Design a protein with these regions (language model features):
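A short, N-terminal "cap"/entry segment at the start of jelly-roll beta-barrel domains
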Residues: 1-53, 133-143
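Small beta-barrel nucleic-acid-binding modules, principally OB-folds
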Residues: 54-63, 68-71
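Glycine- and acidic-residue-biased ligand/ion/polar-headgroup-sensing regions
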Residues: 63-64, 73-88
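Histidine-centered metal-chelating micro-motifs
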Residues: 66-69, 87, 99-108, 126
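Ligand-binding loop in jelly-roll beta-barrel domains
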Residues: 92, 103-131
């Protein structure tokens, strides 16, 4: 159950204070509210979406062995690893470790043991990658 106390923002639409129980937010897959389309096996919990700010806060879960190819998007994202393992840019990241990405190519991201992250997007969260990148990457990290 979300606890809410609305207050009108001086800058426009109403913004709401939220304290949210994780157990009350369902995991979603496939097409997520028209905000993003997920590959098979990947799931998200949308915690907050502000269409005015174009800010999307969510938890994202990747299955063991999943590889996200080198990509870019029309936004920045900030990622905090909360469970499991994320391997990127020669680093083996664990809970508490952080990643920042912008509109320049980054990745691939590998999840050899599976992983859960907290991620914030500012702008369009759609990922853009070359089709060849989807096929040519080989996992370099072992479970």
């Amino acid at each position: 159950m979300a606890i809410k106390a609305a207050k009108k923002s001086r800058r426009g639409p109403s913004h709401t204070f939220r304290a949210i129980y994780d157990r009350d937010i369902p995991w979603e897959s496939d097409d997520v509210r028209g905000l993003l389309t997920l590959p098979a096996g990947v799931k998200v919990k949308v915690l907050n979406y502000d269409p005015v700010m174009k800010r999307l806060d969510m938890k994202q879960r990747f299955p063991a062995g999943y590889v996200e190819p080198r990509h870019t998007h029309k936004s920045w994202h900030s990622i905090l690893v909360t469970k499991g393992r994320m391997c990127v840019a020669g680093k083996d990241l664990r809970p508490g470790d952080y990643v920042f990405g912008w509109d320049i190519p980054h990745g691939p991201y590998e999840y050899p043991d599976g992983c859960e992250v907290f991620i914030v997007y500012m702008g369009d969260a759609t990922h853009v990658w070359e089709k060849e990148d989807l096929l040519k990457h080989r996992n370099i990290w072992n479970p």
